Design a protein with these regions (language model features):
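Bacterial N-terminal signal peptides that target proteins for export
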Residues: 1-8
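Bacterial signal peptide processing site
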Residues: 20-22
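C-terminal motif of bacterial Sec signal peptides marking the signal peptidase cleavage site
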Residues: 15-18
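N-terminal helix-rich structural modules
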Residues: 29-232
Length: 232
């Protein structure tokens, strides 16, 4: 199995700040590039030379840009799948409120699943587009969800459990198999109850074939049907 590597620049910046008092040779020798390893993923960080020479205002700007990226990430989660945000909330709440044996196979499986979905921005692998297969049981998650505080209870637990554990439900975030309807068979949240021909016909009707610099249609938009009519 191939190992995917991911770079985390913001974490590197913090590491460099913490190592500012060391010599360059000590910093080079001591720097640990690996943040974490799980499943087929290796999370990396790297050095940011001269970060410590930035002005306070420049560092504050980087901080707020990072915060903006984190905040905007929820848009990507939602676009990647209809139930992604609700599933993330469920798994995070079970993880943080867990009061049992954190060395148990069930909990370790939950922790692995949490890392996978956090890395992929959803319940599908970022490269293969296949839905993650949990290595903890449906019964375990249902039991732990039932013990959450009232304000942490999911609205529709059974639906979330089905999406997580049923391999036939939303198996691919983006399906590119030849001969299949790529819209109906993909789990992303940009289309709902609509087919590939309907999507193509909708956008083809909007195109101005005489425009030498045409606009791009469908960016960050969602197509669905209302009263049998395709709407954006």
């Amino acid at each position: 199995m191939s190992l995917t590597k991911f770079i985390v620049p913001a974490m590197a910046a913090m590491a460099i700040t913490a190592c500012g008092s060391k010599t360059a040779q000590e910093t080079a020798d001591d720097f640990d590039y690996t943040v974490d390893r799980f499943a087929d993923i290796e999370v990396l960080r790297y050095k940011v030379p001269d970060f410590e020479n930035l002005t306070p205002q420049q560092r504050i700007l980087i901080y707020y840009l990072t915060e903006a990226a984190i905040t905007g990430r929820d848009i990507l989660w939602d676009q990647n799948g209809k139930y992604n945000l609700a599933i993330r909330d469920l798994i995070e709440n079970v993880y943080t409120n867990f009061d049992g044996d954190r060395e148990s196979d069930e909990f370790k499986g939950l922790e692995l699943y949490l890392k996978q979905i956090e890395f992929a921005n959803g319940i599908h692998h970022h490269y293969s587009m296949d839905k993650f297969t949990p290595v903890f049981s449906r019964e375990f998650l249902a039991d732990r969800a039932a013990k959450l505080p009232a304000d942490r209870q999911p609205e529709d637990l059974e639906t979330l459990l089905t999406v997580i554990f049923d391999p036939t439900v939303m198996p691919k975030r983006v399906n590119q198999a030849e001969g299949q309807d790529l819209i109906l068979t993909s789990a992303n949240n940009l289309y709902e109850n609509i087919s590939q021909p309907e999507v193509e016909n909708y956008y083809n009707a909007l195109k101005d074939t005489t425009d030498a610099t045409p606009v791009s249609w469908g960016l960050n938009a969602r197509l669905t049907k209302q009263d049998g009519k395709v709407v954006e």
